[in-house]
């Protein structure tokens, strides 16, 4: 495992010119830059491959629950977009409608996850929360599956999410 230093982060301007960092930008830079144009409230983008969210992405499975109030109240569900080849405009194509539907977390089929927020820190915090939720749900499945809450209780948390 390598240590990430500030000098290793490729910082780009709005024209795609590198203004900081000594590492080459990712081949997925167009995905990052185009994501900012999808919604006015997007001010930060995180794309990564955390193990549990990536496992769901590799299985092309949405992450959803009827048992975990914290997920229902904060995120509703994490939808999985169809596969698109990394490094091409196809990787974002399936995620665009999900992001346009005010979802902040999108699994990229057979690849990883794309998370947006008001800032990069906000997007990173959502990424960490989403990975913890995916891990809990994955482990719950290993124990025989979740015990769902009542329809009324689920609706309470889904309504709570709509007010955020």
Give residue spans per PLM region.
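Glycine-rich flexible loops
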Residues: 1-164
């Amino acid at each position: 495992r390598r240590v990430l230093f500030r000098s290793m982060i490729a910082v780009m301007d709005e024209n795609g010119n590198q203004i900081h960092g000594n590492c080459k930008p990712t081949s997925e830079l167009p995905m990052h830059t185009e994501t900012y144009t999808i919604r006015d409230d997007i001010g930060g983008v995180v794309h990564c491959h955390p193990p549990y969210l990536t496992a769901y992405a590799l299985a092309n499975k949405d992450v959803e629950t009827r048992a975990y109030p914290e997920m229902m109240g904060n995120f509703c569900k994490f939808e999985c977009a169809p596969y698109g080849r990394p490094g091409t405009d196809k990787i974002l194509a399936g995620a665009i409608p999900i992001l346009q539907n005010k979802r902040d977390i999108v699994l990229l089929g057979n690849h990883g996850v794309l998370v947006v927020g008001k800032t990069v820190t906000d997007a990173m915090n959502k990424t960490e929360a989403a990975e913890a939720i995916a891990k809990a749900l994955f482990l719950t499945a290993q124990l025989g599956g979740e015990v769902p809450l009542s329809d009324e209780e689920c609706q309470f948390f889904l309504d709570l999410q709509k007010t955020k």
